[in-house]
């Protein structure tokens, strides 16, 4: 299956390929990840995700289309809601920063497919500078929580994917803008040792996740996510459970 911008996020592509986001879904809850792949469950996009997509679309040159396709970002007076006015402010801040713009000057949304650890993968890079680096754009609340989102996993897959596709082993950077009152900007390089550790982690987990995806093993239910709550059956519990921990 040849992937394009039109079918990259489609169900058929999700069924055939692993991606970083799908891998992370399996890390959180195997049952929810499988239901999402099979088209039985879809978590609605959060406001934070829409803000990130708003900024992404500026670099892709599709901001006008994004606005047309997402009327919920506007008030009844056809003005941008507060979060998206902040996104506009972030874009203006980024445009004035030469280093940030340099890192985001590569080929936009380049798609690669490859086999890694015995399973097919797909990836889509925000900014690909051939022979130089891979850069991914992130719009976050603040810098402090950046490691909690496990972008090291993304960097590991993107670096290895580019290498397997013949582009060499390229450094991976995060071009990060914050949604603070005064937007902050910086470029973060994820160290090679961190990427190597993340890749080994993926190698250790992917066979099990692939077996669940293929139907060879039953998925585990985390019991706490929205999907698990939506399919659970009521049971009798001890009230004192709620007093523990």
Where do the protein language model's features map onto the residues?
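Non-catalytic protein-protein interaction segments used by genome-maintenance enzymes to assemble
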Residues: 112-152
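Secondary-structure boundary elements
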Residues: 100-104, 129-134, 163-170
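Metal-dependent nuclease catalytic cores that hydrolyze phosphodiester bonds in DNA/RNA
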Residues: 1-124, 234-243
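Short amphipathic alpha-helical face segments that pack within enzyme cores
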Residues: 54, 153-161
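Short histidine-centered catalytic/ligand-binding loop motif
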Residues: 43-44, 76-79, 142-150, 191-193
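Hydrophobic (often cysteine-bearing) scaffold residues that line and stabilize catalytic clefts
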Residues: 47, 51, 154, 198
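Metal-dependent nuclease catalytic regions and adjoining charged, substrate-binding loops involved
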Residues: 84, 147, 160-245
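Hydrophobic/aromatic-lined pockets within catalytic cores
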Residues: 59-63, 139-142, 163, 167
């Amino acid at each position: 299956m040849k992937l394009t911008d039109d079918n990259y996020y489609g169900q058929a592509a999700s069924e055939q390929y692993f991606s970083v986001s799908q891998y992370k879904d399996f890390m959180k809850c195997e049952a929810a990840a499988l239901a999402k792949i099979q088209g039985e469950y879809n978590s609605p996009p959060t406001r934070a995700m829409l803000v990130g997509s708003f900024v992404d679309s500026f670099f892709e040159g599709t901001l006008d289309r994004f606005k047309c396709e997402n009327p919920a970002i506007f008030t009844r007076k056809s003005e941008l809601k507060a979060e998206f006015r902040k996104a506009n402010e972030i874009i203006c801040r980024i445009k004035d920063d030469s280093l940030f713009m340099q890192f985001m000057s590569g080929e936009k949304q380049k798609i690669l497919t490859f086999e890694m650890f015995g399973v097919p993968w797909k990836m889509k890079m925000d900014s690909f500078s051939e022979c130089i680096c891979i850069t991914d754009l992130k719009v976050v609340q603040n810098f402090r929580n950046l490691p909690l989102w496990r972008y090291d996993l993304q960097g590991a897959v993107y670096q290895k994917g580019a290498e397997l596709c013949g582009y060499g082993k390229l450094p991976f950077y995060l071009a990060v803008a914050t949604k603070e009152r005064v937007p902050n900007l910086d470029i973060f390089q994820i160290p090679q040792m961190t990427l190597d550790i993340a890749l080994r982690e993926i190698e250790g987990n992917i066979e099990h996740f692939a077996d669940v995806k293929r139907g060879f093993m039953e998925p585990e239910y985390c019991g706490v996510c929205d999907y698990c709550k939506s399919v659970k059956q009521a049971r009798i519990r001890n009230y004192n459970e709620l007093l523990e921990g």
